[in-house]
Amino acid sequence: NIIVDDQYVILEGQHRYEAIKDLGLPLTYTIINPEDSESFIISMNTNTKNWKNDEYLNFYAKKEKTKNPLNYHDMPYHNFKRARYYKIHFMTLIELIYSSRQKEHTIGFGKGKLFIQDKALFKENVNFLVTAMKQHKACEHRNTQLALCKYLIDKNFDKETFLEKLKKFPDKLVPSSTMDQATLNIKTL
């Protein structure tokens, strides 16, 4: 069954539609109210298997693009998606946005309530993490990224000095199995 809106735009089942069309089989579809489409699609998909954070991300990024075709690139889920493209971990980005990893933030993310209060600072911190990751493989590690978030919150943390020290003493920073160890590694650097 294909899900369409009142304008017959396919909301769910694009691949099924293509396969049915190619096979010449009869097509069945359900028309739903556009206002209900978001909750209906999420509910339908979570009943078959639980959605992962990146599936919510793609869903809401697509919704932002549809609702704001001229400026969707500056919308919260698109900024988040751009950072995910660079392999920054999901919880690291939640920490950068909210200075916290509380469950309520991830629940809100899945409900379409992502809000980035300071987009410029978020982008600056993402760019810093991308630079650090390019400079040292340990910065790709989740615990290192989360530990760096704690430092990024500190106004006295000098990003340039950190990157210079990382270049000079790369052996001091190693992947860590705990965030405490990652924090200590960064501190000793």
Region locations from a protein language model:
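Accessory terminal alpha-helical modules
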Residues: N1-L189
